[in-house]
Amino acid sequence: MNQALPNSFRSGPDERGHFGIYGGRFVAETLMPLILDLEKAYAEAKADPAFRAEMDNHLKHYVGRPSALYFAERLTEHFGGAKIYFKREDLNHTGAHKVNNVLGQIMLAKRMGKPRVIAETGAGMHGVATATMCAKFGLECVVFMGAVDVERQQPNVLRMKALGAEVRPVTSGANTLKDAMNEALRDWVTNVHDTFYCIGTVAGPHPYPMMVRDFQAVIGQEVREQIMQAEGRLPDSLVACIGGGSNAMGLFHPFLDDPGVAIYGVEAAGHGLDKLHAASIAGGKPGVLHGNRTYLLMDADGQIEEAHSISAGLDYPGVGPEHSWLHDVGRVNFLSATDTEALDAFKLCCRLEGIIPALEPSHALAKVADLAPKLPKDHLMVVNMSGRGDKDLASVAEHLGGKF
């Protein structure tokens, strides 16, 4: 914590993909040429105005951006403190923030001449976004999904199949997101010649954490413009949920060098931090998983522990390496919310705002319930409403015994 602070919190990663001691490229030798190819292709695409122009066109006409910045009037009134705004990523085509990143990666796959795309998915939102973009751009799509998640996210499984994707249930480990990612990496090693791996969060080997962050930064860039229009100044705080952390990184990154903006990331505390949870920063330590060094849930022998969250999208035993670094340098405050707190926030948002939030951003809303009442009425707080909750209704009904 006492390390010298950087001149900018936005300059990472270095050329080897490190954010301080985190990140990097811990991959099998067979994958190294692919990773280097991808890095080169991404650098070229980033420097190509035609790539950016095409992407902006699809974001506007296909995804439906910019997404609204909405003043949550009744929630603000209810808490009696900070003025709360929602960044409405739930209104994007496919229903979450995931599509911002997938559009960029699928355009890159097309540019690299890869006809086959693989992806891992937890809640199914990244899988749906990938299947959607593969259909739009005419690419083959295979999605790896833990068998447990296939059960609890049936609507999304059906959406992926309707869009022409093959969904492969993964029955190893805890049958959830970590295991789906393991399988996807195995498939990639086997099919290096024709396959593009579309990772759904700011994790994995470099350049993925940087690339996904760059594609998601459209969220925070829009918020800067929208809040200036609405309030004439920048927000005082930002709040977002964290699984791997791509929705949060998309909101946070454009504000990291604004010292007046407090930033809160909310992890999933599951049944409690002393029990089963998915809060890698609150309850983990640095280690290596899925190609990068970051905070992980590990036992005393360094074995990866199973994560638990009511939300399939936060149920991951790690976190993006840039978040790990931002925690260590003290720029982002990491909090956590339990399953029960998230369910309470879910119900409150439905009843007060007429918005059914996904269980993921319900974790962020749960901490808004703690933070907002203690803040003055002129405090501007922006919460990332990262996805809609249709996919979670069956699961929520089950937890609430059928009584909403």
From Swiss-Prot:
GO terms for molecular function: tryptophan synthase activity. Tetramer of two alpha and two beta chains. Its cofactor is pyridoxal 5'-phosphate. It holds the Pfam family PALP. This is Tryptophan synthase beta chain. It comes from Rhodopseudomonas palustris (strain TIE-1). HAMAP family: Trp_synth_beta. The beta subunit is responsible for the synthesis of L-tryptophan from indole and L-serine. PANTHER family: TRYPTOPHAN SYNTHASE, TRYPTOPHAN SYNTHASE-RELATED. Pathway: Amino-acid biosynthesis; L-tryptophan biosynthesis; L-tryptophan from chorismate: step 5/5. It catalyses: (1S,2R)-1-C-(indol-3-yl)glycerol 3-phosphate + L-serine = D-glyceraldehyde 3-phosphate + L-tryptophan + H2O. Keywords: Amino-acid biosynthesis, Aromatic amino acid biosynthesis, Lyase, Pyridoxal phosphate, Tryptophan biosynthesis. InterPro entries: Trp_synth_b_CS, Trp_synth_beta, Trp_synth_beta/beta-like, TrpB-like_PALP, TrpB-like_PALP_sf. The gene is trpB. GO terms for cellular component: cytoplasm.
